[in-house]
Structure formats: structure tokens, C-alpha cells
Amino acid sequence: MNQLEFVKLHGNGNDFILIDELNGERIPEDEKSEASRILCHRNFGIGGDGVLFLVPSERADIGMRLFQPDGSEAEMCGNGIRCLAKHAWESGYVGERFSVETLAGVIPIQVRRDRKGFWARVEMGIPRFERSEIPADGEGTFLKVPLHGFEVSAVNTGVPHAVIFVENLDIPVEQIAPKIRHSSCFPEGANVNFVRLGNHLEVRTFERGVEAETLSCGTGSVAAAAVARRLGLVGETVEVMTKGGPLRISFAGEKAFMEGPAVTVCRGVVSDEILQTLQ
């Protein structure tokens, strides 16, 4: 493997290592999973909540693939796609309006920059509430279902999410969430969101694949807003506050939109010592 350049970015503290493969594969397909496990390690690697691969696409302007710290590939990531959009736009690959192919489908994006920094508005598609589309066991919708002592609702916003409304967010998320994340109700597992309703939504998310709480989750924020809207708790636009900062979630008809920032942290080259472990 030749020299491997990377870019480190974050969206509200949800941090990613980006590998640009638009002009050629940098990490072979059969090594991407293990490479992501190594690169994401916060002690022995670069550290991150996932590795983003910017790749060519025949269906959209560019493509995105995301491998998580456990080596699994995720269908979609809301914070990750904003980071990828920032790199693609600043590299001159795309204009202010473009589309990104993901495993969850083709995602339209609009980007801008103001005095506060870079922002991306992402069309997140129509949240899917049918159990067959989440997926979850059974038929119909999965709303306010008793599970492990909580009322759990579930929705797919690119990836499956469980949403739980609580009065107090000061709870041991990493002790409680794995029981729901691995519940037999969800054959592919689920991300788990604990949500407090106030003037805005406050969300803490335990992410599948990261297997830990992250500072922010874009698809989780959309899931929280979508379930709250479905239950009549919020209107067409809502601010979602994560530990890493706010996201603006809005709806036009049934389509959901997410708007938020992305920040470039650094650029670098993976050391020869780490490269040797990838070969």
C-alpha cells in the first residue's frame, strides 16, 4: 500500500476519518473492514466513530461508504454525510447542490458557508415506521411498545433506531441501551436514543457499530424528531440538542431534512507502522 492520506472531521463531535478514493482505491475492498477497526481505535489508531470512504458513483455525483469501529458497514450516517459533503465541496468535486449515493439510497444535499462556518442541509428521505422496513419483528408500526421497562418506538431513518422518551436524561445509557440495541425485536439490531421533550428535543444516542454513546447522531436526531412528530409532540420544525451541539430537523410533507455543521480537524498521513498492520 502506498502512502495513505486521511482527513479528520467531525459533525457536532461525532468524529470520522475520511479516505478519499475518488481517484482510485486506497484501501482494498477486502481490507476496509479490518482497516476501519484499526484506524478508529482511540489508543492504537487515529481514533474516530467511523471511517468514511469518498467513492465514485454511477447513480449520484459522489458516493459514500461508512465502516464503523467494529468493522461493520453502515447504510447511512447523518453527521458523517455532512463531513463527507464538506470535504467534497471544498475539494472542488461538487457544487453547492449535489447528491451522494449511500447504501440507504441517493441523498440530495445543499451546502453553504457563513461567518459561523460550514453547514449542510441533507434530505434524509421519508422516515419508515412499518416494522418490515425498520426492521422489527411483527406487523404494523412499532410505537410505544413495552420493552425492558421502557416504552419504545422504532423508525428507520437510513438505519434502524429505537426512541425512548424520558423525563430525566441523567441515566446510565451505556448500561441500559445494549439490552434494547440487541433485543430480539430488532433482527439487525438498533441504535438507541433517549429523548427528553422540552422547548426542544434533547437526545443521547447509543450507536450500533460504535457500541457506545456518541456525542451526536444525525440519523438518531431525525429519528427522535420523526417519532415525536408522529406522536403529536412537535411540529414541522424542531431543534434537537445533542451533547455535541444542535441540529435543525424539519419536515416537508413526509420528507425529513437535517441541517447542521461540519468541521475539519486535521489532515495527515498514516504512519508506516500502522500501514504494515493493514497489509
Swiss-Prot record:
Which sites bind substrate?
Answer: 14, 68, 78-79, 191, 207-208, 218-219
Q: Which GO terms describe its biological process?
A: lysine biosynthetic process via diaminopimelate
| Matches recorded under Pfam families | DAP_epimerase
Q: Which InterPro entries match?
A: DAP_epimerase_DapF
Q: Which SUPFAM superfamilies match?
A: Diaminopimelate epimerase-like (SSF54506)
Q: Location of site Could be important to modulate the pK values of the two catalytic cysteine residues?
A: 161, 207
Enzyme class per UniProt: isomerase
Q: Which Gene3D superfamilies match?
A: Diaminopimelate Epimerase, Chain A, domain 1 (3.10.310.10)
Per UniProt, the keywords (alphabetical) are: Amino-acid biosynthesis, Cytoplasm, Isomerase, Lysine biosynthesis
Named in its record, the pathway it takes part in is: Amino-acid biosynthesis; L-lysine biosynthesis via DAP pathway; DL-2,6-diaminopimelate from LL-2,6-diaminopimelate: step 1/1
Give the signal sequence positions: none
Catalyses: (2S,6S)-2,6-diaminopimelate = meso-2,6-diaminopimelate
**EC number per UniProt:** 5.1.1.7
Extract the GO molecular function terms from the UniProt entry: diaminopimelate epimerase activity
User: Record's Gene Ontology CC terms?
Assistant: cytosol
Catalytic positions? 77 (proton donor), 217 (proton acceptor)
Where does the record place it?
A: Cytoplasm
Main function: Catalyzes the stereoinversion of LL-2,6-diaminopimelate (L,L-DAP) to meso-diaminopimelate (meso-DAP), a precursor of L-lysine.
Q: Which NCBIfam families does the UniProt entry name for this protein?
A: DapF (TIGR00652)
Q: Which family does it belong to?
A: Belongs to the diaminopimelate epimerase family.
The record describes its quaternary structure and partners as: Homodimer.
- Protein name per its UniProtKB record: Diaminopimelate epimerase
